Curated annotation (Swiss-Prot):
Belongs to the MntP (TC 9.B.29) family. It holds the Pfam family Mntp. The keyword Acyltransferase does not apply. The keyword Membrane applies. Its main location: membrane. One of its GO terms (molecular function) is manganese ion transmembrane transporter activity. It comes from Escherichia fergusonii (strain ATCC 35469 / DSM 13698 / CCUG 18766 / IAM 14443 / JCM 21226 / LMG 7866 / NBRC 102419 / NCTC 12128 / CDC 0568-73). Probably functions as a manganese efflux pump. It is found in: Cell inner membrane. The gene is mntP. Keywords: Cell inner membrane, Cell membrane, Ion transport, Manganese, Membrane, Transmembrane, Transmembrane helix, Transport. The lineage of its organism: Bacteria, Pseudomonadati, Pseudomonadota, Gammaproteobacteria, Enterobacterales. This is Probable manganese efflux pump MntP. One of its GO terms (cellular component) is plasma membrane. It is a multi-pass membrane protein. The chain crosses the membrane at residues 3-23, 66-86, 106-128, 143-163, 168-188.
Amino acid sequence: MNITATVLLAFGMSMDAFAASIGKGATLHKPKFSEALRTGLIFGAVETLTPLIGWGMGMLASRFVLEWNHWIAFVLLIFLGGRMIIEGIRGGDDEDEEPRRRHGFWLLVTTAIATSLDAMAVGVGLAFLQVNIIATALAIGCATLIMSTLGMMVGRFIGPILGKKAEILGGLVLIGIGVQILWTHFHG
């Protein structure tokens, strides 16, 4: 795989994380750049590891991974998105609210895993090609770091406009990503 194909693959793989990061950034009360970078680093690290894991699994048992990865991603994203929607509906008026709580480490990791299962599936496919898997995984991770950090900062500006509805929107984005993963699996 040449450098152009690797870069296109890397940024293509980062789009789910970018969309999820916009939702995350919108639900926080004015996230700082350090929080955006933290999110980018977590998403980027997970997106670096998942193609490597997928590549290893592809060498061992690609059929099982390809049969189940879309369902795992779908369930995780529906759960996380549903949780965000419920929290958004339960919330009070924005004026009466304390500053929104920060997203915990494990919630970010879970979201990163859910949005990176497609990268794991790509890793399975890469196991059957002549590709430098380390360089490709690093490219995917770096692209995801950049796009997730950018997504959080974009979300920062959307959040105050939407208020508490941002959490509902973020949940809908995650559910939409899950549905898109399932749709793509069944309809190519």
